[in-house]
UniProtKB/Swiss-Prot annotation:
Keyword list, A-Z: Acetylation, GTPase activation, Nucleus, Phosphoprotein
Organism this protein belongs to: Homo sapiens
In-chain residues carrying the UniProt-annotated modification Phosphothreonine: T478
Principal cellular location given in the protein's record: nucleus
Signal peptide span: none
UniProt cross-references to InterPro entries, sorted A to Z: ARHGAP19_RhoGAP, Rho_GTPase_activation_prot, RhoGAP_dom
Chain segments carrying region Disordered: 349-368, 399-421
General function of this protein: GTPase activator for the Rho-type GTPases by converting them to an inactive GDP-bound state.
Name used for this protein in its record: Rho GTPase-activating protein 19
Positions of the record's site feature: Arginine finger: R143
Coiled coil: none
Record-level Gene Ontology MF annotations: GTPase activator activity
Compositional bias (Polar residues): 399-415
Tissue-specificity statement: Strong expression in fetal heart, brain, placenta, lung, liver, skeletal muscle, kidney and pancreas. Weak expression in adult pancreas, spleen, thymus, and ovary.
Length: 494
């Protein structure tokens, strides 16, 4: 039990010394989740798209790479793996036949040194990386060579796939560091692959521009980081995994440079030939680009904690792809859509505010209009029977064909319910207080209710005028019969 407790405590202790280690997921230990931690991977949809639809994923990433760096047709074809890399001096990677033959021989022997990179090989090499993380303060680490005899013993053990007890004191840190460099140097191609060679040269040339649009000599770090993030996304998975482990180790080593005397640039000089340089070339072949390659390697070491996160717009594109939405092809598309959404929201908010502000004013105007009309009709109603009174009543009935000023109903409301907001209907609703109307009809009288009220209280002449002049009024047989039965004894409402 003590052994188990000690082994369980080793991981936090080891991680506590590596506070800046790369972490691509977040663990949530919520007590309400029955003690089961939930892992949130921000690049979940990116990884899902990479594994399930590699062609779509590659097209998405490459289209954004070409937005940042200029790749002519041949270099773009090299990045896509359609043509082989052409190097100065006629040098080039070994032919596919010889590479396959050499790999087959090594595979038969079960060796990992000199074989194509695999996850099994990375698992063996990880023992070296893990040991070096505990010995970062050794002066001259990765620069001082170790003992060749001990290195051969260690090499054979790794090729045989046996677990090695590096804590026994049999091996020195310099032995392990040198063997790690040997492993990288014997890979069939550099860790960053031949296909990406020209792209890394272009990334090293990304410089800032001044206010006049002229290119300066100041590196554009943000664009370089973004381009490297994209480029690392299309690396083969074994290469990407080992590169992540290696850069993290070198980053932690450079942080202890006050003890080990190894800065990021010094480490870049040690590892650029194994990580970036194409195979079968010399320093003379790369004399024009050797400074760029070394500086590029140093830049990757310094910013390694940012390089293995997918850009936010790539995450969004991958997420939208699986949510059934339109997939944007670049960062500019997403920025444009976000801008459109913001403007639409602001416009809708402004329109809503205007409608709210105008409602009290409209209601107040309508109230004053209704009060004035009610007083006017009450005055006409109180007049003695005369020709003048009948003439005024006819004028009120004619106004039933026009709508109340300032209260134009919408087209959809007219088509749906065919309501009429006329002067005559409005007056009769306020003055007569029709008991047959519901509370809702008191505010919006229908043409049928207007017609019924007029039939009950108007003379035959006015009824003829009303029905002949108002095409909006319709009478059902039931209501017409009811109204005719009531007209005896009620000749008029005046």
């Amino acid at each position: 039990m003590a052994t188990e407790a000690q082994s369980e405590g080793e991981v936090p202790a080891r991680e506590s010394g590596r506070s800046d280690a790369i972490c691509s997921f977040v663990i949530c230990n919520d007590s309400s989740l029955r003690g089961q931690p939930i892992i949130f991977n921000p690049d979940f949809f990116v990884e899902k798209l990479r594994h399930e639809k590699p062609e779509i994923f590659t097209e998405l990433v490459v289209s954004n790479i070409t937005r940042l760096i200029d790749l002519p047709g041949t270099e773009l074809a090299q990045l896509m793996g359609e043509v082989d890399l052409k190097l100065p001096g006629g040098a080039g990677p070994a032919s596919g036949f010889f590479r396959s033959l050499m790999s087959l021989k090594r595979k038969e022997k079960g060796v990992i040194f000199g074989s194509p990179l695999t996850e099994e090989g990375i698992a063996q090499i990880y023992q070296l990386i893990e040991y070096l993380h505990k010995n970062l303060r050794v002066e001259g680490l990765f620069r001082v060579p170790g003992n060749s005899v001990r290195q051969q013993i260690l090499r054979d053990a790794l090729n045989n796939g046996t677990d090695i007890d590096l804590e026994s004191g049999e091996f020195h840190s310099n032995d392990v560091a040198t063997l790690l460099k040997m492993f990288l140097g014997e890979l069939p191609e550099p860790l960053l692959t031949h296909k990406h060679f020209n792209a890394h040269l272009k990334i090293a040339d990304l410089m800032q521009f001044d206010d006049k649009g002229n290119k300066t000599n100041i590196p554009d770090k943000d664009r370089q980081i973004e381009a490297l993030q994209l480029l690392f996304l299309i690396l083969p998975p074994p290469n990407r995994n080992l590169l992540k482990l290696l850069l993290d180790l070198l980053y932690q080593t450079a942080k202890k440079q006050d003890k080990n005397k190894m800065s990021a640039y010094n480490l870049a000089l040690m590892f650029a030939p194994h990580v970036l340089w194409p195979k079968n070339v010399t320093a003379n072949d790369l004399q024009e680009n050797i400074t760029k390659l070394n500086s590029g390697m140093a830049f990757m070491i310094k910013h390694s904690q940012k390089l293995f996160k997918a850009p936010a717009y790539i995450r969004e594109c991958a997420r939208l792809h699986y949510l059934g939405s339109r997939t944007q092809a670049s960062k500019d598309d997403l920025d444009l859509i976000a801008s459109c959404h913001t403007k639409s929201f602001q416009l809708a908010k402004s329109q809503k505010r205007n409608r709210v502000d105008s409602c009290p004013h409209q209601e107040e105007t309508q109230h004053h209009t209704e009060e004035a009309l009610r007083e006017l009709f009450q005055h006409v109603h109180d007049m003695p029977e005369s020709a003048k009174k009948k003439q005024l009543i006819r004028q009120f009935n004619k106004q039933s064909l026009t709508q109340t000023p300032g209260r134009e109903p919408s087209t959809s409301q007219v088509q749906k319910r065919a309501r009429s907001r006329s002067f005559s209907g409005l007056i009769k609703r306020k003055v007569l207080g029709n008991q047959m109307m519901s509370e809702k009809k008191k505010k919006n009288p229908t043409p049928e209710s207007v017609a019924i009220g007029e039939l009950k209280g108007t003379s035959k002449e006015n009824r003829n005028l009303l029905f002949s002049g108002s095409p909006a009024v319709t009478m059902t047989p039931t209501r017409l019969k009811w109204s005719e039965g009531k007209k005896e004894g009620k000749k008029g409402f005046l």
